[in-house]
């Protein structure tokens, strides 16, 4: 769900507002879940080629529906934007029982870009941690220890990608970051 109010000023200095309403078209997204710290779940099979290009035919899409207004008050997000400021390559890659372990040689925060030629429906998990426990990434030192989240430790600092299986696929999480 979303509501959009885009205000802009044209070259002549006149202000304009574009607001979303029931005339807008909508379709399901390949982004199934996102959380600033928990990670993303992205299904590449649901991608719609060209959806964000001029002239895309969205006539098969549904019209947007008015949803109940959320409770609470709107607040401006004060978090700094997540920008690419550096790209790192791993200093080592080790095969483990559960997959591969990538060591970047430093403690940092960011996201990993996945480039893969996977099989249709193949599910790939990218787990992040700042140190190892029993040879696997451990998140005990970087998750928010709250009682009601204890059951969700499995999902902390993890991105999940499901492959389309049609050649090289590239996935970079857009709405999260991790310590590793």
Which role does the model predict for each range below?
Residues 1-180:
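Extracellular/oxidizing-compartment recognition motifs
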């Amino acid at each position: 769900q979303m509501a959009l109010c885009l205000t802009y000023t044209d070259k002549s200095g006149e202000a304009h507002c574009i607001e979303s309403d029931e005339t807008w078209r909508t379709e399901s997204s390949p982004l199934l879940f996102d959380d600033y710290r928990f990670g993303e779940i992205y299904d590449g099979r649901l991608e719609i080629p060209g959806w964000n290009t001029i002239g895309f035919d969205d006539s098969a899409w549904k019209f947007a529906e008015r949803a109940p207004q959320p409770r609470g008050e709107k607040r401006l997000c004060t978090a700094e934007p997540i920008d690419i400021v550096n790209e790192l390559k791993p200093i080592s890659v080790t095969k483990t029982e559960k997959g591969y372990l990538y060591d970047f040689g430093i403690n940092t925060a960011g996201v990993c870009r996945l480039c893969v030629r996977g099989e249709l429906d193949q599910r790939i998990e990218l787990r992040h941690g700042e140190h190892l426990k029993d040879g696997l990434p451990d998140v005990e030192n970087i998750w928010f220890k709250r009682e009601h989240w204890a059951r969700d430790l499995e999902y902390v600092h993890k991105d999940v990608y499901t492959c389309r299986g049609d050649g090289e696929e590239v996935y970079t999480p857009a709405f999260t970051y991790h310590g590793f």
